[in-house]
From Swiss-Prot:
Reactions performed catalytically: Release of any N-terminal amino acid, including proline, that is linked to proline, even from a dipeptide or tripeptide
Protein residues bound to Mn(2+) 2: D265, D276, E439
Classification of source organism: Eukaryota, Fungi, Dikarya, Ascomycota, Pezizomycotina
Species in which this protein is naturally found: Coccidioides posadasii (strain RMSCC 757 / Silveira) (Valley fever fungus)
Protein name: Probable Xaa-Pro aminopeptidase PEPP
Source superkingdom: Eukaryota
Length: 469
């Protein structure tokens, strides 16, 4: 692990700095810069007909202003007084025998970057306390709709603003500080070890689920206690399903003994910060001719797109470049027919590359602030999760792919207008490839990018790793 990352993460999560940034964003959006910001953490929720709690996932906006992973907690930031207060559950004698003593206010104050720690039960009293002096009392509280429990009251305040806080948080969370980038680096470091472990286990594995287990266990053993999303471990034609989750197919044909290629899209989560990495490689240790041809196209798509990345460049333009490279490659193979210009104009490549090139990444895999437009009439951009220009300290994924999904492609083949652009006889050789996607995580810098992802992707190197096991 990178010692420089470890040194950064030895400090406190910069919650106070984040609170100040959000306050500045509120002011920049036309508000007077006064008031109290209010956020709740995730509540403990019990599974139906059970005394077990459902798996806990902390609210990301709450964590951004607290650094706290405890359930049933609150945070307030008094903008005028520059005071950040965390409210955590007090000890419940009935629970201590089962779960041990909870974090005390004194321990929490040492652990978190806040000015004061109170009990969760004191939230209403402290909100009222803000308003005891009418001359200096904040007039407004900023909160998020449907993120305030019934027990909380804002009656002491003259006004509750339900519109501004979510947008301010989204704008701030887009731009990562050094501490957040260190968390994302560590998440990538752990996930790189896990991807490499899967590559080494691939040749002898019998079922997709075995390789999912390798990924999860490697992450856990290195401090990543959760996954950014459900791992995608897709062999052969399963790789044509973008978010395949079954992960339960045998990896060897019982009749021929053939082993297909594998697509693994998986990322561990470290202290709520994500990684999102995809690699594809042959389970036998040697790409088939068709799989290698598609792999080379996708790697070229990613390389050319990454060459364009720097501040001020429109993500739409980078995404369009990926489609143009895909068209050129599929034309060379004879899968497509016609001119590059006409194929791009007709959006034929969408049949093989239906999703967006990438997205913001942070505490959420598909992080906030991307401004997608799923109503876009242009099918090439409809599923693009990031619309706009790049800025320094944003973190994006770059994940081009080429897929052979019958459900998507066959309507093109049967279309009188579009079918002529695809040679079905040539296409028939590629269905078994399933899909190839290559995905890295990049930090936008002042003059380009920093690639956080170190998992090998050179095809010869990948083959060698799988062969050696």
């Amino acid at each position: 692990m990178d010692s420089a990352v470890t040194a950064v993460l030895a400090g406190k999560y910069p919650a106070k700095q984040h609170a100040r940034r959000v306050a500045e964003a509120l002011k920049a959006s036309g508000h007077d810069g006064s008031g109290v910001i209010y956020l709740e953490g995730t509540k403990t929720r019990m599974a139906e007909d059970s005394d077990e709690a459902v798996p806990f996932r902390q609210r990301r906006n709450f964590y951004y202003l607290s650094g706290c992973e405890l359930a049933d907690s609150y945070v307030t930031y008094n903008i005028d007084q520059d005071e950040l207060v965390l409210y955590i559950p007090a000890a419940d004698p009935d629970e201590v025998m089962w779960t041990g003593l909870p974090l005390s206010p004194e321990e929490a104050l040492k652990k978190y970057d806040v000015d004061k720690v109170l009990a969760s039960s004191e939230i209403n009293a402290h909100l009222a306390h803000y308003c005891t002096n009418k001359e200096t009392a904040p007039k407004r509280v900023y909160a998020i709709p449907d993120r305030v429990c019934a027990e909380t009251t804002f009656l002491p305040f003259d006004d509750t603003n339900w519109d501004a806080l979510s947008n301010a948080l989204n704008q701030c969370r887009k731009v990562k500080d050094d501490y957040e980038i260190a968390l994302l680096k560590r998440s990538n470091e752990i996930s790189a070890l896990a991807h490499l472990a899967v590559m080494k286990a691939a040749k002898l594995a019998k079922n997709e689920r075995e390789l999912e287990a390798v990924f999860r266990s490697t992450c856990l053993s290195h401090g990543s206690r959760g996954q950014s999303y459900g791992p995608i471990v897709a062999a052969g034609v399963n790789g044509a399903t973008l978010h395949y989750q079954t992960n339960d197919m045998d990896l060897e044909d019982l009749v021929t003994g053939e082993r297909p290629s594998l697509l693994v899209d998986a990322g561990g989560e470290y202290r709520l910060y994500c990684s999102d990495i995809t690699r594809a490689y042959p389970l036998s240790g040697k790409f088939s001719v068709e799989a290698r041809q598609i792999y080379d196209i996708v790697l070229d798509m990613q390389t050319q797109c990454m060459d364009m990345i720097k501040p001020g460049v429109a993500w739409d333009d980078i995404h369009a470049r990926a489609h143009k490279v895909a068209i050129s490659g599929l034309l060379r193979l004879g899968i497509l027919r016609g001119s590059e210009e006409e194929l791009f104009e007709k959006r034929i490549s969408v049949a093989f590359f239906p999703h967006g090139l990438g997205h913001y990444m942070g505490m959420d895999t598909h992080d906030v602030g991307g401004n997608p437009n799923h109503a876009d009439p242009n099918p090439m951009f409809r599923y693009l999760r990031l619309r706009g220009t790049l800025s320094p300290s944003e973190v994006v994924t770059v994940e081009p792919g080429v897929y052979f999904c019958r459900f998507i492609i066959e309507p093109y083949l049967s279309s009188p207008e579009l079918g002529k652009y695809i040679d079905s006889a040539v296409l028939d050789k590629y269905w078994k490839v399933g899909g190839v996607r290559i995905e890295d995580n990049l930090v936008i810098t002042q003059d380009g990018y920093l690639n956080l992802t170190t998992v090998p992707k050179d095809p010869e190197e990948v083959e060698r790793i799988v062969q050696q096991g």
